[in-house]
């Protein structure tokens, strides 16, 4: 759907077909973009595909459709809710004292005081060095959509926001990074919230190894220096992430929000208290989850208490045992009154899980759109009734953009093998089979023979049934047995012929391993640094130029010669 009728629709079509030309003196390449439906990739869940197609089975689980009218409706709802804009601006201004702040960011922060300014939010944990490519993609999607809405709805202002989930304690997930297929893992003795951990020698050793890999590229030195300026020994991971994202996107006016903040969390004390002592969120979300589970796999189930206790080097669950509230796997415990006092005096010591994090985000931000991945959208679809219970506006949900980046060498192999954009999502075996079948001079299919044999068996069955009707089943069994033998013969014929196509097999394996590392989507494995090292700032520009807004399609970007 277009943003403002036919003119905007035409704009989006032209955007989809455009070529993004690299202007760097050191690069003469250009890039082409192709879009295919998410369903054709085979990498997205049923709930995501159904959400994109506005399937009836999901329409009761979200508030607004992902289109321009949905944005307008979300704005109307948001205006009825009292966001503490003054507090938000104060905390952002305080936060940005730690980094160099662009004029555009300063302007956007100030604009948040205005009741007609709204945020376009995306969120992620502070994975080391940003983790996976989609970290970058979701941020650029938020920036692009905010820019588009500022053009199409000039009566309002839209500001892109990146919400850092710095309280996540899953170091195994957040502490790994892949560079050109090589996995690096951060081994540290630190525990608790990853955002509060500090850059140490072990992490800097990883960065040194990555430097050795990337410094040979045209922009390798530039991207390594960019990361090194932020990941300084002794700095927290949260602040390092903030620094890097700010350096990459400050010129786009992206606001980075660090929600691990005492004053912002005070806004949530009533909800946190409700969760701990009445278990209201758990009851509401459980009901919704049961309804959703009738059609889909549920992404996240609530606990009785959906808060962690966050202090020093721990982030552990709060568990009620009769009249005592214990912090799991520690010796810390509270009575009800003691825990109430702790929450009132130290709200920063209470960390929401995935169920309450969304409420916190939408309470402190004047937000109208949340951009997330498939997993994020799946759990947001469990939360609509929870939002309604607390009278917090539920945003428009938009699936983040997805990309597959194909460098010049791999693109050359794809063209050599005459593969289409859809072909590259097929398995190695299927691709090899198609190439062999298409190029062989021999007959590998026994379809005609099977048809002839089938006719013989049908006639035989008629004949034998005239003698004894029970023999018909025996003929069927013989036919099935023979057809299985013929199927096996076809497999052997194909296998024998494949030997003549060893070169093409190697090329296909090279293509697949490059584009689908660990048999997964590139964006869910690889880091942004190798692509920045090769293409420089144009990497960001190419993604921005080919990012769609509401039009949900998977984008394949090819580097041309």
Q: What is the role of each PLM region?
A:
Residues 22-27, 244-334, 341, 430, ...:
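Long, compositionally biased intrinsically disordered regions
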Residues 44-99:
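Low-complexity, highly charged intrinsically disordered N-terminal segments
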Residues 115-150:
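N-terminal catalytic cores of NTP/NDP-binding nucleotidyl/phosphoryl-transfer enzymes
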Residues 132-133, 146-170, 395:
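Glycine-rich phosphate/pyrophosphate-binding loops
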Residues 162-174, 266, 402-415:
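Short, conserved secondary-structure transition motifs
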Residues 174-179, 406-435:
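A structural-propensity feature for long, helix-poor, extended segments
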Residues 179-205:
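A glycine-rich helix N-cap at a beta->alpha junction
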Residues 298-368, 374-385, 394-396, 401, ...:
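A translation/RNA-centric and nucleic-acid-associated enzymatic feature enriched
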């Amino acid at each position: 759907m277009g943003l403002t009728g036919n003119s905007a629709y035409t704009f989006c079509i032209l955007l989809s077909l455009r070529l993004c030309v690299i202007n760097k003196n050191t690069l003469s390449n250009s890039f082409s973009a192709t879009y295919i439906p998410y369903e054709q990739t085979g990498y997205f869940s049923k709930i995501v595909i159904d959400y994109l197609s506005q399937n009836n089975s999901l329409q009761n689980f979200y508030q607004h459709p992902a289109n321009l009218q949905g944005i307008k409706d979300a704005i109307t709802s948001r205006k009825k809710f009292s966001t503490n804009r003054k507090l938000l601006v104060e905390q952002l201004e305080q936060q940005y004292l730690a980094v160099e702040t662009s004029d555009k960011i300063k302007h956007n922060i100030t604009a948040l005081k205005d009741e007609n300014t709204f945020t376009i939010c995306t969120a992620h944990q502070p994975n080391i060095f940003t983790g996976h490519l989609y970290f970058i993609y979701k941020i650029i999607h938020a920036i692009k959509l905010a820019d588009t809405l500022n053009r199409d709805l000039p009566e309002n202002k839209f500001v892109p926001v990146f919400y850092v989930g710095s309280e996540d304690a899953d170091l195994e997930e957040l502490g790994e990074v892949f560079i050109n297929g090589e996995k690096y893992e951060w081994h540290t003795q630190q525990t608790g919230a990853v955002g509060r951990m500090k850059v140490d020698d072990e992490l800097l050793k990883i960065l040194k190894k990555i430097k050795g890999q990337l410094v040979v590229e045209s922009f390798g030195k530039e991207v390594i220096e960019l990361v090194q300026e932020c990941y300084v020994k002794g700095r927290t991971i949260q602040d390092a992430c903030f620094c890097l994202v700010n350096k990459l996107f400050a010129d786009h006016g992206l606001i980075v929000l660090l929600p691990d903040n005492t004053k912002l969390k005070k806004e949530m004390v009533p909800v946190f208290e409700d969760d701990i002592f009445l278990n209201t969120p758990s009851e509401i979300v459980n009901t919704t989850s049961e309804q959703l589970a009738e059609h889909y796999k549920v992404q996240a189930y609530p606990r009785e208490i959906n808060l962690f206790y966050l202090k020093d080097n721990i982030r552990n669950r709060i568990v009620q045992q009769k009249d005592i509230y214990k912090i799991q796997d520690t010796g810390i415990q509270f009575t009800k009154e003691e825990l109430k006092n702790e929450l009132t005096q130290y709200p920063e010591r209470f960390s929401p899980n995935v169920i309450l994090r969304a409420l916190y985000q939408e309470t402190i931000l004047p937000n109208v759109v949340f951009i997330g991945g498939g997993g994020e959208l799946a759990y947001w679809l469990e939360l609509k009734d929870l939002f309604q219970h607390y009278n917090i506006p539920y945003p428009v949900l938009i699936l983040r953009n997805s990309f597959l980046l194909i460098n010049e060498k791999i693109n050359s192999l794809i063209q050599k093998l005459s593969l289409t954009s859809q072909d590259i999502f097929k398995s190695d075996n299927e691709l090899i089979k198609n190439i062999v079948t298409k190029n062989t001079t021999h007959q590998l299919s026994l379809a005609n023979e099977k048809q002839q044999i089938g006719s013989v068996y049908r006639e035989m069955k008629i004949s034998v049934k005239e003698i004894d009707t029970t023999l018909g089943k025996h003929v069927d069994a013989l036919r099935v047995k023979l057809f299985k033998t013929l199927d096996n013969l076809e497999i052997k014929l194909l296998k024998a012929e494949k030997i003549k196509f060893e070169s093409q097999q190697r090329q296909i394996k090279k293509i697949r391993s490059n584009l689908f590392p660990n048999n997964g989507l590139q964006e869910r494995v690889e880091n942004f640094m190798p692509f920045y090292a090769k293409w420089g700032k144009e990497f960001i520009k190419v993604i921005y130029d080919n990012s769609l807004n509401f039009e949900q399609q998977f984008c394949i970007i090819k580097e041309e010669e």
